[in-house]
């Protein structure tokens, strides 16, 4: 049976926060380190005029203030993602826009995909919203300020005055923790995570759609079709590359 004082604390915290308390949840404090056992926060950022080969737009969902609070933990985990795509194109506009949430550390050499979450919307949709419950972890020894970026692909969409009139709003719910175990629904709904019951889609949606949080807007100008950056090892140079290099050397 759950301790009555804990029930009271959960109820009080839930009512006071109204899903808008984005600071640390100090329930069970690690006595040795004098810090919250878990740190739970939601952040939001907006990209305007997206669509182009500048695929890895920095999200800026973390700042130095956040880093100081999480660096003593072992892991940073994304547990929720919301993507909102806003289009200002006419209803008969063809094509699609594809949004990729990327891990900028992952490369071809790691034999892993960079895409954490992918979302596709019709170009003519006035507003498309998608919410995902995810489980993605990185070590806090990584450069967490620059890890997550957004990639955009516009397929068959006409360019208007050199730009695509799309805006993307990206929201992340993340948790700082020392746990090496995979977070599950029971853990997210435990007393260490007083931000709502994420098994309830309505509550999850209410939390993700908050407007009290400060948003950062980034102008991402169109610069050609989106092409994920790829590099070829020197061992895979084609005969044309070798010939071109040889001619350049002989001419000099």
Swiss-Prot record:
Region of interest called Disordered, as start-end residue ranges on this chain: 222-252
Swiss-Prot/TrEMBL GO biological process terms: transport of virus in host, cell to cell
InterPro entries: Viral_movement (IPR028919)
Record has Hydrolase as a keyword: no
Pfam families hit by this protein: MP
Keywords recorded for this protein, A-Z: DNA-binding, RNA-binding, Transport, Viral movement protein
Keyword DNA-binding: yes
Single GO MF descriptor: RNA binding
Family membership: Belongs to the tobamovirus movement protein family.
Physiological role: Transports viral genome to neighboring plant cells directly through plasmosdesmata, without any budding. The movement protein allows efficient cell to cell propagation, by bypassing the host cell wall barrier. Displays RNA-binding activity.
Name of protein: Movement protein
Originating organism: Tobacco rattle virus (isolate PpK20) (TRV)
């Amino acid at each position: 049976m759950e301790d009555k004082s804990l029930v009271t604390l959960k109820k009080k915290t839930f009512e006071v926060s109204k899903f808008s308390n984005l600071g640390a949840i100090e329930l069970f404090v690690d006595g040795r380190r004098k810090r919250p056992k878990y740190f739970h926060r939601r952040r939001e950022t907006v990209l305007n005029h997206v669509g182009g080969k500048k695929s890895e737009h920095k999200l800026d969902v973390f700042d130095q203030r956040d880093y100081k609070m999480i660096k003593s933990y072992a892991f940073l985990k994304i547990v929720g993602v919301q993507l909102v795509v806003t289009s200002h194109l006419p209803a008969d506009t063809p094509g699609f826009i594809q949004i990729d949430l990327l891990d900028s550390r992952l490369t071809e050499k790691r034999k892993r995909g960079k895409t954490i979450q992918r979302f596709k919307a019709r170009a003519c949709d006035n507003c498309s919203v998608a919410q995902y419950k995810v489980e993605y972890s990185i070590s806090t020894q990584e450069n967490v300020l620059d890890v997550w970026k957004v990639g955009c692909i516009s397929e068959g969409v006409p360019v208007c005055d050199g730009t695509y009139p799309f805006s993307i709003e990206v929201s992340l719910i993340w948790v700082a923790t020392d746990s090496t175990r995979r977070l599950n629904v029971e853990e997210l709904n435990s007393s260490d995570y007083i931000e709502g019951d994420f098994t309830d889609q309505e509550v999850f949606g209410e939390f993700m759609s908050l407007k009290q949080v400060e948003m950062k807007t980034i102008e991402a100008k169109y610069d050609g079709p989106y092409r994920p950056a790829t590099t070829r090892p020197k061992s895979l140079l084609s005969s044309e590359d070798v010939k071109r290099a040889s001619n350049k050397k002989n001419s000099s």
